[in-house]
Amino acid sequence: MKKRDTFYITILFILPILFVLCVSTYSMYGSKLDWLSQHISLADYFRQTQQLLPDSFENLQGQTNAFSFSYYGLLRPDVLVSYLFPNIPIHFFIIGYATLLWSSTGGLCYCWLRNKGYKDSIRFFSSICCICANCFFQSHQQIMFVEILPFLFLSLILIDS
């Protein structure tokens, strides 16, 4: 990897983090409707049970099976890591995980385009367009449908190699 590639990937990794930090100074990065009412409150309840895979949740929907809530991230990586740190609020993990995935998408897009043989300027501009896309604007509203993009670029890199 060239020195210029490392510089571009570093810029692509830092830009989303700076955006989240700028937004977070005045409010929380995330939607109060989707994040707070669903993902944060349910992930916090999952942690309060102190079980990795409980059979059921006694206080939710009349003792419903735990896998009924898999849509809300029962076994998401950020929720699993948050089990190790019960004193840290869950919204820090969810914001950090969303930011990490958003940041890594730009770098993975750049690497995929580099493997395809595009010029440096085209790779960098395309990766900037990727991290500024509308779906990442929505990442502060909904987290479930945007988290797949870095894994998409990673799979494209692996398929091409």
Question: Whereabouts are the PLM-identified features?
Answer:
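Start-transfer (signal-anchor) and selected internal transmembrane alpha helices
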Residues: 1-22
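Membrane-interface starts of transmembrane alpha-helices
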Residues: 4, 85-94, 119-126
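Membrane-interface coil-to-helix junctions
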Residues: 16-105, 130-149
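Transmembrane alpha-helix boundary and packing residues in multipass membrane permease domains
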Residues: 79, 107-111, 157
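Transmembrane helix-loop junction
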Residues: 83, 114-115, 161
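Transmembrane-helix signature of polytopic, membrane-embedded enzymes
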Residues: 110-132
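Extended basic-aromatic, gly/pro-enriched interface segments that bind polyanionic ligands
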Residues: 152
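Membrane-interface transmembrane helices that cradle and orient dolichyl/undecaprenyl
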Residues: 155-161
